[in-house]
Each structure stands twice: as structure tokens, then as C-alpha cells.
């Protein structure tokens, strides 16, 4: 029993304490006899025109929360009319627990399905950072997303086996890797995904080494554009020239999406 839950304890660090959400608006979605908490916020351009042209379904890291970032991130998309839907995983913030890896994939799909009902045909871009990239890739493999943004994507099984297996002769790493849910298989989901994708890759990532990013990039089955985050570590925010590149790349992503739909 303990070994079966070991990946949850090693990877997920949920918090429940209230966080100031700025101007973000809280909503909930029914999920597995409980609720999934989502925080929404619009960019200035979306507010000015009375609605968004693009929706960004946002998934965060293994110790992070949507209520911390949704409003702040909406402000950074100054060139686009967007609405952020930031998802708190089960067990995080106001989302019903428990926090389990096996619940992340289904929760991500439930959030997408709710957003799709709201979006009215407008494009939905799934954006995930760190473990959030595994959720975004799962959605892209299961649903018709308009595009993907993947920030330091981790191939969890491969990391456990290759980075931690040697010191225990794979006696612990092997069983732990097998406990990673198939929904969060970044390599398999990358191969199955066809939406245009933007990869944001920190070249000094100390948590998900760049060689592991590359496994996901190389497996990805759709059109892709890479943005190198030079000198950046795993949790460094996107800013400066990289933020300008991301805004430009979103325009490319949307054009690719339109081309594929013709």
C-alpha cells in the first residue's frame, strides 16, 4: 500500500491555505463526487473588447496554485485578448481531495470539457509548467485543443528510472516508475498529440534536466516551436525577451491551428 502511494508523496506537495487571488474569479466544476476549483482572469485587451478571443487552460507545478497566478498571468498577455482558466489539482486549494497523481489526468480533461462548453468554438490552448505539462499533454492527446504551451516538461517515468535508478539498482525506482499513471506518460501523449506546440525550455533547469526536456520535444507529433530560456532555472518566471518571444509564438500557434482546421 505504501509503495503504491509513494509517487504521490514524492511528487505532489498540496497546500490548502487561502491565497490572495487578485482580480481572478473563482468557479467550480463537479468532479468525482466533489469539485474542481478553477480561477479565471482576462487580459486587458479581453476586458476592453468585452470578451476573449483565446482561452488558456493553465496547469501549474507540483507545489503551486492557480489562485496565486491567474490574474498576474492574464496581465502578461498584453498583445492578445485571452482568458486564463487556471486549474487547482484535486487536493490543492479549494479542490476536493485527496491529492493523487491518478486524479490529475481526469481532472484536466474535466476542466477542458467545462471550458469547451463556455468557449463557444473559440480556440483553447493548454499551457502546463513542470508537472502541469503532463496534464496539458494528456488533454492534447484526448481532446481537440487549439495548441499547447509546455514549460520544462518532465517525462516522469524516464526521470525516475534514469536519474534515480542507479543508486538502488532499480529495485525501488522500477516499481515507483510503474506507479506513474498512464495518463501522465509524457512521451506517449506527446507522440499522440497533433496540435501546434510551443516549448519553453530552461537551459539551466536543475529539476528536470534539459536532456529530459528533449525526450518530450523529440517525441512530439505535431508542429512545434522552441523558445530557449537562456540562463533560466526550473522555476524562473518568463520575462523580458522570452516573454516577447512567447507572445509572438502564440500568434504563430493560432495561425497553425487555423491552417489545420481548413
Region roles according to the model:
Residues 72, 185-186, 195, 209-218:
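Short alpha-helix in the alpha/beta-hydrolase fold that links the catalytic acid
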Residues 119-130:
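Alpha/beta-hydrolase fold nucleophile elbow
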Residues 138-189, 195, 238-239:
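Hydrolase active-site cap/lid region
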Residues 192-194, 198-201, 205:
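Short beta-strand/loop motif that positions the catalytic acidic residue
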Residues 203-208, 235-236:
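Acidic catalytic loop of the alpha/beta-hydrolase fold
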Residues 214-262:
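C-terminal catalytic histidine-bearing segment of alpha/beta-hydrolase fold enzymes
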Residues 36-114, 122, 134:
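Membrane-embedded segments
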Amino acid at each position: 500500500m505504501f509503495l503504491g502511494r509513494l509517487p504521490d508523496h514524492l511528487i505532489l506537495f498540496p497546500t490548502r491555505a487561502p491565497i490572495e487571488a487578485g482580480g481572478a474569479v473563482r468557479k467550480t466544476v463537479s468532479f468525482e463526487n466533489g469539485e474542481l476549483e478553477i480561477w479565471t482572469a482576462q487580459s486587458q485587451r479581453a476586458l476592453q473588447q468585452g470578451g476573449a478571443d483565446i482561452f488558456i487552460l493553465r496547469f501549474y507545478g507540483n507545489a503551486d496554485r492557480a489562485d496565486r497566478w491567474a490574474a498576474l498571468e492574464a496581465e502578461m498577455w498584453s498583445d492578445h485578448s485571452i482568458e486564463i482558466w487556471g486549474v487547482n489539482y484535486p487536493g490543492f486549494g479549494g479542490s476536493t481531495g485527496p491529492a493523487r497523481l491518478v486524479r490529475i489526468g481526469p481532472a484536466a480533461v474535466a476542466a477542458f470539457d467545462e471550458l469547451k462548453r463556455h468557449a463557444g468554438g473559440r480556440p483553447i490552448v493548454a499551457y502546463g509548467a513542470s508537472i502541469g505539462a503532463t496534464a496539458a499533454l494528456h488533454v492534447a492527446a484526448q481532446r481537440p485543443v487549439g495548441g499547447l504551451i509546455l514549460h520544462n516538461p518532465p517525462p516522469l517515468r524516464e526521470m525516475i528510472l534514469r536519474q534515480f535508478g542507479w543508486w538502488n539498482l532499480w529495485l525501488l525506482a522500477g516499481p515507483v516508475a510503474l506507479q506513474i499513471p498512464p495518463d501522465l506518460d509524457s512521451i506517449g501523449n506527446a507522440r499522440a498529440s497533433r496540435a501546434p506546440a510551443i516549448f519553453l525550455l530552461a537551459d539551466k533547469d536543475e529539476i528536470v534536466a534539459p536532456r529530459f526536456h528533449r525526450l518530450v520535444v523529440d517525441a512530439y507529433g505535431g508542429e512545434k516551436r522552441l523558445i530557449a530560456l537562456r540562463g533560466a532555472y526550473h522555476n524562473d518566471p518568463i520575462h523580458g525577451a522570452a516573454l516577447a518571444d512567447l507572445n509572438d509564438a502564440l500568434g504563430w500557434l493560432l495561425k497553425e491551428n487555423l491552417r489545420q482546421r481548413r
